Design a protein with these regions (language model features):
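ALDH superfamily catalytic-core signature
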Residues: 231, 259, 267-327
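A structured beta-alpha segment of the ubiquitous adenosine-cofactor-binding alpha/beta core
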Residues: 170-171, 238-261
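Generic hydrophobic/aromatic pocket-lining and core-packing "Φ" positions
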Residues: 198-199, 248, 325
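Conserved small-residue-rich beta-alpha loop and adjacent elements
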Residues: 157-234
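Hydrophobic face of amphipathic alpha-helices that form TPR/SEL1-like repeat modules
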Residues: 1-67
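Generic beta-strand/beta-sheet core signal
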Residues: 58, 121, 136, 147, ...
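Glycine-rich loop-to-alpha-helix module at the N-terminal edge of alpha/beta enzyme cores
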Residues: 58, 62-158
Length: 327
């Protein structure tokens, strides 16, 4: 006898009347409670780092629930994390894209295997309902798989070019990593919008300094856990924790990183875009939200359309860039 294949979880396939899903989630909530309230260090060069004091994270569902105590990093911790990423980058790039793809796919598989546990922690941490939390965790795994698949399908973007009729000339376009990337993730998609940019940078041969939102720090912890358990070497992805005005600012303003990905507010994102590339061109990818329309066709079922628009606009309190804002 073989186990039945696991149902693929997506935002589209999730249903509130799925009793099996609810039973698995409820069991995961009980398991997740055992992880609440503990202390969580930063991870720099594969080593735990205590930082300068701690900050507490409490659940928006119930302020009596202590999600955890997290290390409060300093500017010096960020500098050390950047140095660790720099020291690891050449060996990571030399590993070869095929091996990096293998490690990213393994990370994605671990996240999928732990979907209920990670979703339960996310629901407690940021207050998402269980369906949205489950959808996000599986989306996180799929984003990692996407970057891995793009590298595979395109042979890591190594392409022969025209020799202009000279048989002695061999010209190729090749892909090379930039070096060290900073990734600053938001609270509203604390796993997906960390896993996506982190894995995109890693599969390309870059190393990473990752800062989760302080209100999404547990999701940062589980991403680092999955990367470690998949076999990603120490120092390749480093996690710093703490306030945006110190830890985030040190990362965003550093001349020692080669690119940055940020998801968050318009004010911070525009300031980052203006300042990060001022001295010289560097990749600066900022996502600051949008105005998302819904179009209701004449042939639509109006009851279903109205419910869909309502859920799209006000799910998770509307606190997401994908929330419907125009009809």
């Amino acid at each position: 006898m073989t186990d039945a294949p696991r149902t693929k979880i997506t935002y589209a396939t999730l249903r509130a009347d799925n009793e099996e899903l609810h039973a698995a989630f409820e069991a995961a909530v009980e398991a997740a409670r055992a992880r609440l309230g503990g202390g969580h260090p930063m991870i720099i060069a594969g080593q735990e780092r205590a930082g300068e004091g701690e900050f507490e994270l409490r659940s928006p569902i119930d302020q009596d629930i202590l999600v955890g105590r997290f290390a409060k990093g300093t500017r010096a911790d960020v500098q050390d994390a950047i140095a660790a990423a720099r020291a690891s980058q050449k060996a990571w790039a030399a590993l070869g894209w095929e091996r990096r793809v293998e490690l990213m796919n393994r990370t994605a598989d671990l996240i999928s295997e732990r979907v209920h546990e990670y979703a339960a922690l996310m629901a407690i941490e940021v207050g998402k309902n269980r369906l949205e939390a489950l959808g996000e965790v599986e989306e996180s795994a799929d984003l990692i798989r996407y970057y891995a698949r793009m590298a595979e399908e395109n042979g890591f973007y190594e392409k022969p070019m025209d020799n202009l009729g000279d048989p002695a000339t061999h010209t190729r376009s090749v892909s090379r990593p930039y070096g060290v990337f900073g990734v600053i993730a938001p609270f509203n998609f604390p796993l997906a919008l960390a896993a996506g940019p982190v894995s995109g940078a890693l599969v390309a041969g870059n190393t990473v300094v990752f800062k989760p939102a302080s209100t999404g720090a547990m999701s940062g912890v589980v991403l680092m856990e999955a990367l470690r358990d998949a076999g990603v070497p120490d120092g390749v992805c480093n996690m710093v924790l703490g306030p945006g005005e110190t830890v985030g600012d040190e990362l965003a303003s550093s001349d020692a990183i080669d690119g940055i990905v940020f998801t968050g507010s318009y004010v911070v994102g525009m300031g980052l875009q203006r300042n990060f590339t001022k001295a010289y061109p560097r990749p600066c990818i900022v996502e600051m939200g949008g105005k998302n329309p819904a179009i209701v066709m004449k042939s639509a079922d109006l009851d279903k359309a109205a419910e869909g628009i309502m859920r799209a606009a006000f799910g998770f309190g509307g606190q997401k860039c994908s929330a419907n804002s125009r009809v």
